[in-house]
Amino acid sequence: MNRYQTLQKKLVPFKKGCFIPFIILGDPSIEMSLKIIDVLIENGADGLELGFPFSDPLSDGKTIQKAHLRAFSSKMNIYLCFEMLQKIRKKYNTIPIGLLLYANLIFKFGINNFYLKCFNVGIDSVLIADLPVEESNDFRKCAIANNISSVFVCPHDAKKNVIKKISLYSTGYIYLLSRSGVTGTDKKIIVPSLNLIKNLKKITEKLLIQGFGISNSKQIQKIILSGISGVICGSVIIKLIENHFQNEKKMLKNIKRLSRSLKQSTIIF
């Protein structure tokens, strides 16, 4: 049983959804990034979705683009990211940790080398934002060889043949897209249709986790009530980092409050 399955087993009987925050490693610095992760986990995060700083993050809106730049300003690179991941896994042995990255970053490092490194530092899953499932064969082979779960994005308007393929190849969880476009909290999100959720649940028992633009309790409650397993929230957290990173105490206090609120919203009474 992998960590996502363990999380699912823990949540389902109690009618709870999972809250998974997303941040960029090294934003705004290595030390502060590690403190942010501590605060998130201590205040409700059920898992982590983490990004490596990347020079051309096409799927990201302005808020997360700035996070990539702040991480680069703190001299982050792929090797320091793996060092951070090793520390995080050593401290938090039971929670699922996934990476959300871009294909070129992995390709430059060497696909098999990358997945081997992920295995060595205890990563559970890798989602490649700009990799269509139809072009994923080389990446999936290396993921399987190194015991890393693959995650693919399922659009809210996905056709049945796409749903089947994503359900088959996503071995960690299935990422449900709130809408098309780039990340950010300034656009309306879409809860996938009950028909899509029903079709997915017919063919898979994996966690269904929705991301992209989720920023408040009302959105989360609507998502969980629709039958989705949990949410990934990134921009709303990263905006707090952007606004307060020059005042660490205030930043961590605000992230603590937000994390508690977002987690509480996943619990259905």
Curated annotation (Swiss-Prot):
Catalytic activity field: (1S,2R)-1-C-(indol-3-yl)glycerol 3-phosphate + L-serine = D-glyceraldehyde 3-phosphate + L-tryptophan + H2O
UniProt keywords, alphabetically: Amino-acid biosynthesis, Aromatic amino acid biosynthesis, Lyase, Tryptophan biosynthesis
Record-listed E.C. numbers: 4.2.1.20
Coiled-coil blocks: none
Pfam families for this protein: Trp_syntA
Listed pathway(s): Amino-acid biosynthesis; L-tryptophan biosynthesis; L-tryptophan from chorismate: step 5/5
Disulphide bonds in the chain: none
Residues the record marks as active site: E49, D60
CDD domains with a match to the protein in the record: Tryptophan_synthase_alpha
Entry superkingdom: Bacteria
Gene3D superfamilies: Aldolase class I
Any one Gene Ontology molecular-function term assigned to this protein's record: tryptophan synthase activity
Example of a GO cellular component annotation carried by this entry: cytosol
Quaternary context: Tetramer of two alpha and two beta chains.
Family: Belongs to the TrpA family.
PANTHER family in the cross-refs: TRYPTOPHAN SYNTHASE ALPHA CHAIN, CHLOROPLASTIC (PTHR43406:SF1), TRYPTOPHAN SYNTHASE, ALPHA CHAIN (PTHR43406)
Function, as annotated: The alpha subunit is responsible for the aldol cleavage of indoleglycerol phosphate to indole and glyceraldehyde 3-phosphate.
Protein name in the entry: Tryptophan synthase alpha chain
